[in-house]
Swiss-Prot record:
Phosphothreonine modification, residue list: T635, T646, T659
Subunit details: Monomer and homodimer; the monomer preferentially binds to CTNNB1 and the homodimer to actin. Component of an cadherin:catenin adhesion complex composed of at least of CDH26, beta-catenin/CTNNB1, alpha-catenin/CTNNA1 and p120 catenin/CTNND1. Possible component of an E-cadherin/ catenin adhesion complex together with E-cadherin/CDH1 and beta-catenin/CTNNB1 or gamma-catenin/JUP; the complex is located to adherens junctions. The stable association of CTNNA1 is controversial as CTNNA1 was shown not to bind to F-actin when assembled in the complex.
Segments of skewed composition (Basic residues): 882-892
Protein name: Catenin alpha-1
Family, as annotated: Belongs to the vinculin/alpha-catenin family.
UniProt-annotated stretches for the region Interaction with JUP and CTNNB1: 97-148
PANTHER family named in the record: ALPHA CATENIN, CATENIN ALPHA-1
GO molecular function, one term: structural molecule activity
Entry's Gene Ontology BP terms: cell migration; cell-cell adhesion; negative regulation of protein localization to nucleus
Region feature (Involved in homodimerization): 2-228
Keyword Transferase listed: no
A single cellular component GO annotation: adherens junction
Role played: Associates with the cytoplasmic domain of a variety of cadherins. The association of catenins to cadherins produces a complex which is linked to the actin filament network, and which seems to be of primary importance for cadherins cell-adhesion properties. Can associate with both E- and N-cadherins. Originally believed to be a stable component of E-cadherin/catenin adhesion complexes and to mediate the linkage of cadherins to the actin cytoskeleton at adherens junctions.
Amino acid sequence: MTAVHAGNINFKWDPKSLEIRTLAVERLLEPLVTQVTTLVNTNSKGPSNKKRGRSKKAHVLAASVEQATENFLDKGDKIAKESQFLKEELVAAVEDVRKQGDLMKSAAGEFADDPCSSVKRGNMVRAARALLSAVTRLLILADMADVYKLLVQLKVVEDGILKLRNAGNEQDLGIQYKALKPEVDKLNIMAAKRQQELKDVGHRDQMAAARGILQKNVPILYTASQACLQHPDVAAYKANRDLIYKQLQQAVNGISNAAQATTSDDASQHPGGSGGGELAYALNDFDKQIIVDPLSFSEERFRPSLEERLESIISGAALMADSSCTRDDRRERIVAECNAVRQALQDLLSEYMGNAGRKERSDALNSAIDKMTKKTRDLRRQLRKAVMDHVSDSFLETNVPLLVLIEAAKNGNEKEVKEYAQVFREHANKLIEVANLACSISNNEEGVKLVRMSASQLEALCPQVINAALALAAKPQSKLAQENMDLFKEQWEKQVRVLTDAVDDITSIDDFLAVSENHILEDVNKCVIALQEKDVDGLDRTAGAIRGRAARVIHVVTSEMDNYEPGVYTEKVLEATKLLSNTVMPRFTEQVEAAVEALSSDPAQPMDENEFIDASRLVYDGIRDIRKAVLMIRTPEELDDSDFETEDFDVRSRTSVQTEDDQLIAGQSARAIMAQLPQEQKAKIAEQVASFQEEKSKLDAEVSKWDDSGNDIIVLAKQMCMIMMEMTDFTRGKGPLKNTSDVISAAKKIAEAGSRMDKLGRTIADHCPDSACKQDLLAYLQRIALYCHQLNICSKVKAEVQNLGGELVVSGVDSAMSLIQAAKNLMNAVVQTVKASYVASTKYQKSQGMASLNLPAVSWKMKAPEKKPLVKREKQDETQTKIKRASQKKHVNPVQALSEFKAMDSI
């Protein structure tokens, strides 16, 4: 490796290296590699007994190689003449290509005259390899000349940054900044071009990050230097200027390293084979390792390896469980899942020992493998929920510590500023810690990179914000100090938003909503207790947390809906968020203010506790409704077992009384009572549910054909199916519906969806010219109306527990059976309606011509089939599947092609 120091430019280049680092060199080299390879492979079966003679094909190919070489020579001459850098090396490389081209021309001609000669073939292969090496070296040299040009511009910017930092007065500072700005812009354009051409994704990311830091921090360095010149006595300004200058130096080094495709100091900061989180990668890897061929199983080899891997995973899980933000119940669940995973591994190893030496895995072994993967999946889910506990708590009212710090600085209270600076620093560290926790359990490789980059920038910004506050505290009347503080405040808030969005991208909205719902429930109960205990501060603080959580839920859900095509689903979700933000939260805020005012007055004024409790309950209900609306399009397979927790949460205060008689029976929900049915009655219900599942599978098969974007009939069918599944789950003592009122509410939702489907169906029928199709569709729509009505009646399931002669008897089975039957009938009607709607739409299209292919809101497009590998992979590999953002085109690797020619030397 040689380093060229021209004008203090550290240019690293190994003249012997043939490593191709950019896509441009690959693209230019590819045609020549293809032509040479084709020529070399001509008649490659070796000597034959056929009549010797001239090969026209070989001559044609040799001529094309010669022409391609001439083209390279023309371009090489032009580059060598125009290049300001590495001129001598480029001229020498062009001459080498010319020399090797002549040798190749001679060897190819001889081979074309006698293509059956192995000696002449060997000579041509060696000449081809030498030619490709020479051309590759020429292209790499030309590429490095471009890099050298970029490094020269980088040096100009680096010197300009130093001059800006060391400016002796404000006039000089202004001149230096004015001169630096266009140079930075010029460098940014050159670096962006280089970034696009880099082959290595890591180098591209490094270049992008460094460019961003440079663009953002040059104006901030100007402001910081200006503040230093105006207030030389304030140490905080000097500290800030030095911090920003250090960041800019790192950015310059980052651009230099990325441009030359060399490793930077921080390249190995985040190991992990998958590029995702360490814990997620370890779990994915463990899931792969547990699949072993019984023939090759050896306890001495596999047991220590698997146990060691698992203990490493459990150590990571334990760290998360012991973190301060992890709830006690979540900690207990993580510990329980860790123990369950340990036990499942021991059971699996025992089964492997029993199957050792066999060709096929036994059913018991397959069952143990399934159990093992289920347990690791359960552990994953609890870890995700633990991370969401942290995210929900930490990314809440993120600007409060900053505002408190700035307020203290404006008052000129340096002692308070130092105290609040510590709080602010802890808050920043918590955000960074939680962001890294979220990364550890995520498989989203690109998302994890973005989170870590954002967290790193936030970490660098934290001391700068504190220094700006200390400077403002020293000169609270200074306009420059206030502007400087505003600048850093804006930068901090922007960076926190970027980090928040990045964390949201790598976490599941389903997990976020489940955890937020539980946290709001906790806070609502705390609010009610604070009200009863007349704790004004506690009430105000907890109510603020509720408002913050609700606002965050609304923001996250609204952002998520931007990813969907507008339709029935998005309307329902946005309707629920609008209800919470426009109606529920204002009422809750009003009640909180009234309560705080009543409790703060002397003497304390009486207030309506029930009104406050109702307003609090509505907040929880609003969050739950949003969550249910978001989950509406999820299939049962996509829903976690814990998406609807089995506990019966009571939002009301401990002293409040339930008024709905049918809601709680002897302290139990109706759903819990249904779960206590005798086995005989459960078997009857199971039989009905199995019949219902058959109809559901028919509906799944029908709707899975169609793309639901722009087709509200398919969206409504999925919604109705989901609600009916919840209702049938209720009859088995499972699912999200707990009480009769929940089932009635679900039936009303189905009726609403049915009426919307009826309206859409009738629109299609009105435009259908075929009377038979029209009559069929209208008949099925009438069935939907009928079965919706039946379902509404059957939804009033009265589950009761009676004590007859000392024996507990659970009633309500007949109602449950009727409910399932009505749901089954409705499901069948929906299937037939979807089919009839499609048929009627096609008749309409044929009669109206291509101009009106689709009716408004009903677009019948076949769903694109899922991409599947040609070779079936193991299920465990599916966790590692990545979605590529662009199609991958296979490029010929010239260096690989060269190495392959070496094998031909022996021919």
